[in-house]
Amino acid sequence: MNETNMIDEIKRLKKEKNAVILAHNYQIPEIQEIADIVGDSLKLSQEATKTDADIVVLSGVKFMAESVKILSPNKKVLLPAHDAGCPMADMIDVDQLKEFKAEYPNVPVVCYVNSSAEVKAESDICCTSSNAIKVVRSLQSDKVIFVPDQNLAAYIAEQVPEKEIIPWQGFCITHHRVKDLEVDKIRKQMPEAVFLVHPECTPDVVKKADFVGSTSQIIQYAKESNAEKFVIGTEMGVLHKLKKENPTKKFYLLSPGLICFNMKKTTLVNVYEALRDEQHEIIVDEYVREKALKTLNQMLEIK
């Protein structure tokens, strides 16, 4: 089956089965093009609760599909690339979190959405990179445990100096490998370019950026800016939407290392087969789901 026929088949199956395709901004262009909704983790979580589809095909990684299932237990949630995980999410498990919490009794736990359902269930509130600062500010406590991303924790600590942020030492391997020397090098080559960086990058990189934000915030900033050249410090998948929405502007990747291989696992064939056979369904234990739902709902209630 050629690509055109496969896309037609995906559309047919989608209609026949009342399915919706949600894709993260880091997915390959072909997946973004067939998706009904493309966005960051927060947008995908919100859209999952709004859709009346019976089947949600989540083109992303496991924790995203779990979040959709937690929020929409009556929907069948499929993860086409069933082995697409997140190394950062795997850097903490529920037992490690319990031990960490025991060191800091009565300190609330803010859990980055890039985490397992079990870790979410053991936390007090969830956050994404687009609402992390609001979430931390919303808490009454002057101390906050933040898991699992040390870099996002460092960025929050800088933005919310009135609170002590106690970080877990996890990180995104894709963003963490970007070096501040790469920023210096491109700054010299393109002094007129605006640097837009994700807060999962290290503090050394973040402090040299012109703007720091989630993928959706980066896309919005580029759209509204009068600048013509942008250097993008997040996973390369976001370039597709940036170039598509801003055809007269130029976008350059900050580092060639900004590629998440797990995000690149989903192919059209995966999506087609997942829909055709309704395979690779995500199941979350009901006890875990109910506890994790509270942390996600707490987040979604914050405006």
From Swiss-Prot:
Residues reported to bind [4Fe-4S] cluster: 86, 172, 260
Record bears the keyword Metal-binding: yes
Regions crossing the membrane: none
Localization in the cell: Cytoplasm
Cofactor remark from the record: Binds 1 [4Fe-4S] cluster per subunit.
Pathway in which the depicted protein is active: Cofactor biosynthesis; NAD(+) biosynthesis; quinolinate from iminoaspartate: step 1/1
Function: Catalyzes the condensation of iminoaspartate with dihydroxyacetone phosphate to form quinolinate.
Family to which this protein belongs: Belongs to the quinolinate synthase family. Type 2 subfamily.
PANTHER family: QUINOLINATE SYNTHASE, CHLOROPLASTIC (PTHR30573:SF0), QUINOLINATE SYNTHETASE A (PTHR30573)
Protein name from the UniProt record: Quinolinate synthase
Organism whose genome encodes this protein: Alkaliphilus metalliredigens (strain QYMF)
Lineage: Bacteria, Bacillati, Bacillota, Clostridia, Peptostreptococcales
